[in-house]
Amino acid sequence: MESREAGVERLYPKITGRMSARYYYLIQLRKQLERVIALYVRNSPHQLLADYGCGNKPYEPIVAPFVAQYLGIDLELNPIADIHIAPTGAIQLDAEKLDVVLSTQVLEHVVDPKQYLQEAHRVLKKDGLLILSTHGYWMFHPDPTDFWRWTSTGLRKIVEDEGFEVVYFKGIIGRAAMGLQLFQDGLLFKLPKFLRPLLAIIMQPQIIFFDKITAQ
């Protein structure tokens, strides 16, 4: 698991930093999360929110100020998780306890996305909110596993199949920019480590430019 310092860099990446290859994507991800918080969370400050698959809790700083309590849900091997996931996949929490479940870039890593979403639905109150982000296109990144990618319609379907109503749906970056991101990532690990940041410094501004002129 990454350190808390790495979590801060995930929120505010530097183009010359260790997450330079994901610079633009991480910025857009944070901005979309901030937008969703502003739309659906900020005006209801007494809510209980749990980060489902919290890792090192990178998004706690931008979520916690707007809820009554922020909790982390993760596997038992995560020492900073407040609530654990049993080996069966069940969240160790009673039904209908949470107002908001936050899931950022986790769904692609779980063995059984259906069960994962069922558990999110179970622990949410009847009018609860699931804030979910995952990948359409992305390079293979096991942590410790990496199983799934979705089209927009495929993602909507698996979420709706588990009883959720989709009220907001937004891509992070457009197809042209994503194509350049994948091109960069395809080259990245062919290069010596000392050259990889240089490739990111060259590619990330192009990804930003093409996303702005071809945004869908």
Locate predicted features.
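Short N-terminal secondary-structure initiator segments
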Residues: 75-81, 123-124, 134-135
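S-adenosyl-L-methionine-dependent methyltransferase catalytic module, highlighting the catalytic core
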Residues: 19, 111-119, 123, 129-216
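Conserved N-terminal segment of class I S-adenosyl-L-methionine
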Residues: 1-96, 100-104, 117
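Short catalytic micro-motifs in class I SAM-dependent methyltransferases
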Residues: 105-109
